Swiss-Prot record:
Part of the small subunit (SSU) processome, first precursor of the small eukaryotic ribosomal subunit. During the assembly of the SSU processome in the nucleolus, many ribosome biogenesis factors, an RNA chaperone and ribosomal proteins associate with the nascent pre-rRNA and work in concert to generate RNA folding, modifications, rearrangements and cleavage as well as targeted degradation of pre-ribosomal RNA by the RNA exosome. Does not have cyclase activity. Keywords: Nucleus, Ribosome biogenesis. CDD domains: RNA_Cyclase_Class_I (cd00875). It comes from the Eukaryota. Belongs to the RNA 3'-terminal cyclase family. Type 2 subfamily. Gene3D superfamilies: RNA 3'-terminal phosphate cyclase domain, RNA 3'-terminal phosphate cyclase, insert domain. PANTHER family: RNA 3' TERMINAL PHOSPHATE CYCLASE, RNA 3'-TERMINAL PHOSPHATE CYCLASE-LIKE PROTEIN. The keyword Nucleus applies. This is Probable RNA 3'-terminal phosphate cyclase-like protein. One of its GO terms (cellular component) is nucleolus. GO terms for molecular function: RNA endonuclease activity. The lineage of its organism: Eukaryota, Metazoa, Ecdysozoa, Nematoda, Chromadorea. It is found in: Nucleus, Nucleolus. NCBIfam families: 18S_RNA_Rcl1p.
Amino acid sequence: MSSETLEFSGCNFFRIRLAYSILSGRPIRIINIRKNDDRPGIRDFESKLIGLLEKVTNGTKVEISRTGTQVIFRPGMITGGVVNLDCGTERCISYFLEPLLLLSPFCKVPMVIKLKGVTNAPGEISVDGMKASWLKVYNKFVLNDEKLDIKIQARGLKPEGGGVVVFTAPIVKTLRPVKRQQVGKVCKIRGQAYVTKVTPSLAYRMIDAAKKAMHGYISDVYITVDQRKGDAGGASPGYGLFLTAETTEGVIYQAEAISRPKGESGVPILPEDIGIEAGHALLQQIYMGGALDSSAQILASTFMTLCPKDVSHFLYGPLPMYSVHALRHLKQFFEIEFKMEDFKKTLKEEEADLKTGSADKAMVTAVGVGYSNLNKTIL
């Protein structure tokens, strides 16, 4: 792979550009970052992400222009190790976990990362969501999963945060190719109604509403209450509902709904509405289908690219825009192309007639680039 500098424009896909730059060893230049904005340049959370990636690598050089609208990133080797970081309250901790998950198998020493900030936020995947659905996909590519964990020591909601998450991951020499096209049938729904610094009766109202929203779909629904007090509850009051559906093949879909952050304008969301919203979001995710949750498609695409030179298949549901752009970035950084087939066309006639959710599923096939962990010390 050539080491010429790749040039990008704009602030979108910032974290995957940095992660892919480190994995491929190719320097990048990002220009015109919010150049027409009232506050041009990179935001505080983006500079924190750069700082975090500098801590888990060795020899990374970053140049940020005076206005902050241009970043030149020259990647180093991935070392991993023990790192503590305060992520601030602008973005959810999952924003920082995403690049870490992509880099973690290829470190010199296993990662132990302690992140402080917001664990659950509206409009973003939560740390719970990553723990439930991403780690399941991670396991398929990395066999040694004994150290793999995302521990939520304290929950933190916006605007104050106060959550604490510890991420640990194993290291491997190479990933293994994966063939996943069986989805199976949904056999159980599990969930967590979390309340921090508010009365726990709200949790039971959310649970009731969610069960009513999913009534008639499946009987095995079990939702626990996660009530956090003191420091474990973070610094802001709030409540939300996180749901997962597991299939007979071990595929996990996840969905979440959360209350409005304290001090935000607008009508407060009732616990009943949150329960209904989470229930419907989960049913929508199940309908979309695929052999993984749609948010984890980027993880599967990246790991399929970094596999040994062998074929991997993965059945995706409809691809969100973020996944499509991730595939384009993989082509730019690793010169890899994915073969995508309409899943309906690959089925036999009697299978195609079964009502198995969305018709827009794609069978994604790729041959890995033969990536191996050169940082790992061999005993």
